[in-house]
């Protein structure tokens, strides 16, 4: 029976070097292969021209190079670009380039589907099929960086893990991808320009805090009232607000990095004064700021955007309590590329 070939990009530099020495070949050959894979983006062994034919054949015998491909590209009227990314096993994920006058932000996915069940999110309606590998996350960033330079004449400035999936339910691969993105051997991007958004997996927040991460953390909160949050995000019954707060305090103690709370305000759900007061009280307990996010419809009439006066009431209360707040206007709504809309609908 033929032995299955391993994806070579799952190997570290040290593992590549050891592969060559185990075949009585110089270790530096591993460095050459590593450069082809990560600096030059090679998708086949044939093009690794500084390796002999016999060395390339050796690699072919033992490994494959799995890579992503853009299956479909859609451009929004506002310039946003949504990619349907085909993985090596046929699954699809979506990633988005969000341009502004001064920034180019990549919104990347971490899972095929999602592990969680947030009622307001289109991705949650998809069954989680598997986690993305580090190279599949990294490749999304590389692809979007190319698009930013092609269409907007500038490299990526920011990365947000706010696409399909819960990053902390795939945290090892997410962290490995970030290591590669920030490494001089990868894209060399500052970790301070990377934000990982989570629905609040408290145990993993604590575990990651121990590793002295340099990226920013955002929490999909939506309500600081337990009953309301559980109704919106049923899985949060396992991660109550008091436990989440303690985990976030631990994060701040370890990193000294403020948390961003993400809050979508819906009509009749979390637009009352009690909701505002609860959020203000919660934010006061840990260094934080708030992003108020416009709701993007997903074809489910149980949710509707709150009235402007409700958003204004939130903004005023937060500012009055010296809590930084930004109202985020969604981009790419016309191509289902906005926050909460990624669901492989058009493929």
Label each residue range with its predicted role.
Residues 1-92, 99, 249-258, 265-347:
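Auxiliary Fe-S-binding modules of radical SAM enzymes
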Residues 76, 109-110, 197, 220:
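Short linear Ser/Thr-Pro motifs
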Residues 81, 93, 104-108, 116, ...:
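Generic beta-strand structural signal
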Residues 145-321:
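Conserved AdoMet/S-adenosylmethionine-binding subsite of the radical SAM
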């Amino acid at each position: 029976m033929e032995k299955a070939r391993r994806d070579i990009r799952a190997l570290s530099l040290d593992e590549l070097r050891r592969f060559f020495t185990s075949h009585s070949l110089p270790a530096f050959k591993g460095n050459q292969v590593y450069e082809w894979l990560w600096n030059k983006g090679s998708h086949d062994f044939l093009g690794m021209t500084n390796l002999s034919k016999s060395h390339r054949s050796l690699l072919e015998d033992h490994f494959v190079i799995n890579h992503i491909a853009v299956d479909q590209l859609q451009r929004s009227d506002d310039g946003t670009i949504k990619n349907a990314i085909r993985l090596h096993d046929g699954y699809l994920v979506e990633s988005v380039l969000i341009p502004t006058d001064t920034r180019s932000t990549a919104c990347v996915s971490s899972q095929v589907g999602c592990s969680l069940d947030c009622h307001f999110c289109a991705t949650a309606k998809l069954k989680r099929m598997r986690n993305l590998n580090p190279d599949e996350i990294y490749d999304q960033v590389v692809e979007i960086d190319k698009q930013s330079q092609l269409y907007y004449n500038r490299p990526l400035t920011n990365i947000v893990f706010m696409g399909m999936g819960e990053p902390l339910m795939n945290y090892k691969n997410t962290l490995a991808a970030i290591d590669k993105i920030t490494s001089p051997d990868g894209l060399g991007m500052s970790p301070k320009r990377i934000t990982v958004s989570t629905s609040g997996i408290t145990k993993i927040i604590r575990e990651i805090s121990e590793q002295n991460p340099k990226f920013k953390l955002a929490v999909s909160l939506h309500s600081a009232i337990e009953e309301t949050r559980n109704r919106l995000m049923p899985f949060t019954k396992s991660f109550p607000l008091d436990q989440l707060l303690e985990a976030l305090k631990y994060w701040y103690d370890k990193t000294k990095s403020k948390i961003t709370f993400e809050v979508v305000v819906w009509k009749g759900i979390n637009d009352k004064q009690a909701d505002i007061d609860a959020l203000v009280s919660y934010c006061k307990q840990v260094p934080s700021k708030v992003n108020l996010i416009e709701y993007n419809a997903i074809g489910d009439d149980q949710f509707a955007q709150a009235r402007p006066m409700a958003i204004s009431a939130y903004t005023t209360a937060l500012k009055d309590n010296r809590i930084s707040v930004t109202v985020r206007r969604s981009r790419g709504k016309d191509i289902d590329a906005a926050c909460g809309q990624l669901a492989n609908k058009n493929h």
